[in-house]
Amino acid sequence: MFLGVAGKKFAVEVDEKEVAIREALPGNNCGGCGYPGCDGLAAAIAKGEAPVNRCPVGGEPVGKIIAGIMGQEAVETARQVAHVKCSGTCEKAKEEYIYTGVEDCEMLPFVPNGGAKACTYGCCGFGSCVKVCPFGAIHIVDGIAVVDKEACKACGKCVAKCPRHLIELIPYSQKVAVDCSSHDKGKQVTAACEVGCIGCKKCEKTCPNGAVTVENFCAHIDYEKCTGCGACKEACPRGVIREV
């Protein structure tokens, strides 16, 4: 009898909503939501501490299920995808020496010139982002990281891992993006890479929506203003603004 009473006294109450939410989540435990795995997110949503559409992997379908569990209206979620802001392939980017050391992006501060490539802003191709991606959505192709748009779940792990901040999350529906992150002046850029942005501002002047600006010699697109007309892509003399 004592054990029965003690069992009731110390029993852990189970939040049925939390259990249902956890079952609805994909279970990747990628941490892209900002919580320690799916269990942490389920608990936060059940307590009202996180929005029902917080899971980037589950996206809108999972968000709708969780909204139903919480008795809320479903919130429309725009899908995102990771994008690498670099075009410096082995063919296009100048290499100053042959690197034979450890291939780890976190070692860049200790590597001469920050890597073999003349451009110190671009992708070194060591692939730390590849190793951290839980969905196999990133691959090193011709010396730079390339994202498989369909496989990417926008968990953001690659964004956090890249020491040069070359990877960003952009709308899945986005039609064009700037594939460069260099802030060097034009002469330095042309000496280091065949396709780097030289900050000429032709894209900025051509955009009919004011979505493109050039800051510190590099073009940037405001995705909220961009309509995907492609005018900037056509105007770019370096071919650094590309379809995504």
Would you name each region that the model predicts?
Residues 219:
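Glycan-recognition and catalytic cores of secretory/periplasmic carbohydrate-active enzymes
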Residues 1-206, 210, 233-235, 239-243:
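Ferredoxin-type iron-sulfur electron-transfer modules and their immediate structural context
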